[in-house]
Amino acid sequence: MTKRALISVSDKSGIIDFAKELKNLGWDIISTGGTKVALDNAGVETIAIDDVTGFPEMMDGRVKTLHPNIHGGLLARRDADSHLQAAKDNNIELIDLVVVNLYPFKETILRPDVTYDLAVENIDIGGPSMLRSAAKNHASVTVVADPADYATVLGELADAGQTTFETRQRLAAKVFRHTAAYDALIAEYFTTQVGEAKPEKLTITYDLKQAMRYGENPQQDADFYQKALPTDYSIASAKQLNGKELSFNNIRDADAAIRIIRDFKDRPTVVVLKHMNPCGIGQADDIETAWDYAYEADPVSIFGGIVVLNREVDAATAKKMHPIFLEIIIAPSYSEEALAILTNKKKNLRILELPFDAQAASEVEAEYTGVVGGLLVQNQDVVAENPSDWQVVTDRQPTEQEATALEFAWKAIKYVKSNGIIITNDHMTLGLGAGQTNRVGSVKIAIEQAKDHLDGAVLASDAFFPFADNIEEIAAAGIKAIIQPGGSVRDQDSIDAANKHGLTMIFTGVRHFRH
């Protein structure tokens, strides 16, 4: 009996050659719509779908393959006599191979001019149904949704006249992933359209971006996935201009770096980061000076660090960066001369280019944190804060220079691991206390790091001070200005201690824990 294939594809890459090879192997081909036209024009003889179903394509193509003559031919078990008899009794011919890919829903909704009606019309119904029927019956039917699998299928058909069970099973699994992701994307689109903030089912889909050598540690397997609807301002979308493949830890650090730099838009700014904590932030009127400040903030920790700059990297800045061992440099652009300098004898230095004009859109993306047996979902900590809403709670008001420095410190503290303390002046970080289990411990570490640069320095805390001992440590170091959320039942103790030492202290009313 002549074997039959059903081919209906929106992505026609490689399909002509595939179909010609099938014909050479003696297969009959059923086809639909535009696919049939393309195959016929290429000289590949096909059977029209309506010759199989006995019904014409109708309703603008919405109904063409949803018919027992199609799904019976796909779902009939070859090892079940009752199935084969039912097919014979109803004049249903078996279909042994399905090649289908789906309407371009993703590509459609990514179009800037897309309308709701156009999106709806690009929801495929018949395609997923055929794929799922064929995949369910993979014991007998081969199903292909990806042109990358054409060669494998043709090779096995040419060698043995049929595909192996292992191949059919693998392709079926791939199809079920494919249709699930397709439906998840549609669900995500409709959830957004109706404004459902807390859906009872969370369906999101990601595409494999990079198979990784290992994860956070060599004993951990890992892979990198990108959202099916890509975020332009993300490490997944960054253009790599030089260097080795990004590692798992590289990606996490780089992601933290581009989140930090988002908050520093107004002036040229450089952020240096290690282990997801900023170890140096500098800002100035030009990017070269901003680099100088970021480097001076911690010239030891910068070794092997990640650097992100919010302005084009020029030659002068590149010359200063080049001698230092860095893992990654990220910027919106690089001058031709700067790129030549940075890549000279630095084949492993990872250099990324990222569209900073897409930052705002990235802020609305949810954050997902895996826990054993579950997933936490929250919006990002990107609340707009206005210094005019802050409250000076001490007798002394901040000076103009202190006010500027406190704003700078408050931006920086958001990205320090809790319990987080940061000491800065008005243009660079000076000391960092991160990740301690008690706040006074973080205060002491930050002061120790900044001890030679405390003149005119200010201090920020990501959460309230639970006891006045923190204020005593800060005052003893000579720091005169503090910014913190407030909110402790012992706030008054901290205020009294600050007043006793002539400090100025601001309460913002907003906490910035980072775990």
Curated annotation (Swiss-Prot):
Stated name of the protein: Bifunctional purine biosynthesis protein PurH
Metabolic or biological pathway, per its Swiss-Prot or TrEMBL entry: Purine metabolism; IMP biosynthesis via de novo pathway; 5-formamido-1-(5-phospho-D-ribosyl)imidazole-4-carboxamide from 5-amino-1-(5-phospho-D-ribosyl)imidazole-4-carboxamide (10-formyl THF route): step 1/1; Purine metabolism; IMP biosynthesis via de novo pathway; IMP from 5-formamido-1-(5-phospho-D-ribosyl)imidazole-4-carboxamide: step 1/1
Annotated GO biological process: 'de novo' IMP biosynthetic process
Isomerase found in the keyword field: no
UniProt superkingdom: Bacteria
Enzyme Commission number, as recorded: 2.1.2.3, 3.5.4.10
Catalytic activity line of the entry: (6R)-10-formyltetrahydrofolate + 5-amino-1-(5-phospho-beta-D-ribosyl)imidazole-4-carboxamide = 5-formamido-1-(5-phospho-D-ribosyl)imidazole-4-carboxamide + (6S)-5,6,7,8-tetrahydrofolate; IMP + H2O = 5-formamido-1-(5-phospho-D-ribosyl)imidazole-4-carboxamide
UniProt xrefs under InterPro entries: AICAR_Tfase_dup_dom_sf (IPR024051), Cytidine_deaminase-like (IPR016193), MGS-like_dom (IPR011607), MGS-like_dom_sf (IPR036914), PurH-like (IPR002695)
NCBIfam families assigned: PRK00881.1, purH
